[in-house]
Regions:
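Short beta-strand scaffold segments in enzyme catalytic cores
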Residues: 85-89
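C-terminal catalytic domains of large/alpha subunits in multi-subunit enzymes
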Residues: 2-80, 90-173
Length: 173
């Protein structure tokens, strides 16, 4: 599923559109959408739109960046929570990527009992996702996966982690 946000960006750029506005337009104007299977809770498009807009605002979306720097935006609906992330990155002359900052805005509804724990959970999720993005690779030889355990599966290192992961929780019911 990590490929989906990239496809949104590719489609937006091919259409000459801003990736944020492209996503907002795709969400449409409805406030809720019923579940596709007829069961479960409806999808609250308004809440998704709100986290996207808030993440963009807090990350300075649309403000100029120096040469070699850029921003990307993505959103996710998971476990009845609405999450938007903006990553600010630098690409060196050698083509090496460094994630400078990630801004996350989430609407999980309800009261957060342990704010520090919730922030740490989101920050850990960002680190895990970046590790998957930067290092995840399974090699297959002779029809079998070469890596036999996590010891052979590289994880992100502290030096590769962004120095800033800003987490913001929207107050909703």
């Amino acid at each position: 599923h990590e490929a989906v946000p990239q496809k949104f960006d590719e489609l937006a750029h091919a259409a000459g559109r801003d990736p944020l506005q492209f996503r907002l337009d795709l969400l449409g104007q409805q406030d809720t959408v019923p579940p596709s299977d007829g069961r479960g809770a409806p999808y609250h498009v308004g809440r998704m739109r709100a986290v996207l807009q808030e993440a963009a605002k807090r990350a300075g979306w649309g403000t100029p960046l120096p040469k070699g720097r850029g921003r990307g935006i993505a959103f996710q609906f998971s476990h009845r929570g609405y999450v938007a992330q903006v990553a600010e990155v630098t690409v060196s002359r050698e083509g090496e990527l460094k994630v400078d900052r990630v801004t996350v805005v989430t609407d999980i509804g309800g009261q957060i009992v342990n704010l520090s724990g919730a922030e740490n959970q989101v920050q850990g999720s960002v680190i895990d996702a970046l590790g998957t993005l930067m290092h995840a690779q399974l090699d297959i030889e002779g029809g079998r996966i070469v890596q036999s355990n996590f010891g052979e599966y590289p994880l992100i290192r502290l030096a590769e982690s962004p120095p800033r992961i800003d987490v913001h929780f929207m107050k909703t019911d």
